[in-house]
């Protein structure tokens, strides 16, 4: 999530959920704004030049040392604001055999299976012998297991 718009126009982000900053560097992201849609960007180390930054390899990757890069004059014009969500590219692929590989599938896949099952019951006009409840929580995304 966007935690701060820095004076240079770059975004400081904060973690919501299980993404680790070690896995965020150089990843493509979309900033989902309140009114302006989605804005594409890239997460970079704050001092990302390996040729100039002598501590590049040893700099800890935390959400205080990586940022989403945008030019200063464009950030506000784009409608980006504190609290907007930053979504990492899941790099989803379906192989020729039908195998689905992607990041962040754990909860989404489970919800998709439950939705498909409910749709199947409806389409086939089937009624289970017992009452079935579909319950989805968001506790993992706010720090609960």
Task: Locate the predicted segments by residue.
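N-terminal hydrophobic/helix-forming segments and targeting peptides
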Residues: 1-145
């Amino acid at each position: 999530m966007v935690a701060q718009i820095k004076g240079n126009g770059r975004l400081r982000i904060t973690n919501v959920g299980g993404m680790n900053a070690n896995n965020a560097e150089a990843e493509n992201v979309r900033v989902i704004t309140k009114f302006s849609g989605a804005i594409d960007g890239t997460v970079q180390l704050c001092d990302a030049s390996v040729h100039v930054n002598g501590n590049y390899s040893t700099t800890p990757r935390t959400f205080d040392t990586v940022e989403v890069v945008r030019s200063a004059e464009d950030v506000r014009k784009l409608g980006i604001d504190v609290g907007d969500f930053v979504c990492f590219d899941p790099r989803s692929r379906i192989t020729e055999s039908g195998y689905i590989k992607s990041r962040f599938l754990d909860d989404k896949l489970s919800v998709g299976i439950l939705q498909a099952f409910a749709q199947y019951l409806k389409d086939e006009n089937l009624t289970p012998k017992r009452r079935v409840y579909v319950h989805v929580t968001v506790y993992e995304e706010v720090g609960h297991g």
